[in-house]
């Protein structure tokens, strides 16, 4: 049963699904769609051609679907789509897109923490975490299972690869390869995200292959792209390695991140559970 508080303002034309909860002082504009089992908490504001997927919770004072913060925007019809079972926490801002027919898209099972900002034309995959005050500029792409730490700034058009983890306070100006971990401003890669991949039950042999490929590519004396070709010949049969190589060989206009910290090249050993550890 849908439960709408009498102080909520819901404009005629808004589409409200079944078992939706709308708390006090929420504002829902006329072109918004709330799918079944959505919860919108007090003072949230949802505008524009926005669709909120089933089971998603919008926390107090979040703002979704507002006019993009882009001077190029001239009132075109643009969209915001948020998937199922997401948590959009307090004061998060997800603006609409720029250019006719384009969409800001957030996948399923994402956590957008307080004060995070998702700008125009961003695309976020499934199971992504944006930590407190993470700031995505326009046209950023964040792939599945990536984690963006607190107070990170991501330059427009940058891509963050799947399963990457970007440490807090980082400034990211170039594409971050999948499966990597890093931090800093300027940003430096710290190697493969071993702990994250193990938690997601990525197999030992795959993790080890990714580590070897990363080291081959990032400390090669033959050149970055030449090393990618060598890695393709040796490990290209592994889908995760193939994804890493394809990502690095096809960067955005920002280019691929080449900086790597010294600790990224430490030798690896294995503990009694089969986990990779630094020696």
Curated annotation (Swiss-Prot):
PROSITE patterns: HEXAPEP_TRANSFERASES. Signal peptide: none annotated. It catalyses: a (3R)-hydroxyacyl-[ACP] + UDP-N-acetyl-alpha-D-glucosamine = a UDP-3-O-[(3R)-3-hydroxyacyl]-N-acetyl-alpha-D-glucosamine + holo-[ACP]. Pfam families: Acetyltransf_11, Hexapep. GO terms for cellular component: cytoplasm; membrane. Its EC number is 2.3.1.129. It comes from the Bacteria. Residues 260-279 are annotated as: Disordered. The keyword DNA repair does not apply. Pathway: Glycolipid biosynthesis; lipid IV(A) biosynthesis; lipid IV(A) from (3R)-3-hydroxytetradecanoyl-[acyl-carrier-protein] and UDP-N-acetyl-alpha-D-glucosamine: step 1/6. It is found in: Cytoplasm. InterPro entries: Acetyltransf_C, Acetyltransf_C_sf, Hexapep, Hexapep_transf_CS, Lipid_A_LpxA, Trimer_LpxA-like_sf. The keyword Plastid does not apply. One of its GO terms (molecular function) is acyl-[acyl-carrier-protein]-UDP-N-acetylglucosamine O-acyltransferase activity. Keywords: Acyltransferase, Cytoplasm, Lipid A biosynthesis, Lipid biosynthesis, Lipid metabolism, Repeat, Transferase. It is an enzyme of class 2 (transferase). GO terms for biological process: lipid A biosynthetic process. Involved in the biosynthesis of lipid A, a phosphorylated glycolipid that anchors the lipopolysaccharide to the outer membrane of the cell. HAMAP family: LpxA. Belongs to the transferase hexapeptide repeat family. LpxA subfamily. PANTHER family: ACYL-[ACYL-CARRIER-PROTEIN]--UDP-N-ACETYLGLUCOSAMINE O-ACYLTRANSFERASE, ACYL-[ACYL-CARRIER-PROTEIN]--UDP-N-ACETYLGLUCOSAMINE O-ACYLTRANSFERASE, MITOCHONDRIAL-RELATED. Homotrimer. This is Acyl-[acyl-carrier-protein]--UDP-N-acetylglucosamine O-acyltransferase. It comes from Chlamydia abortus (strain DSM 27085 / S26/3).
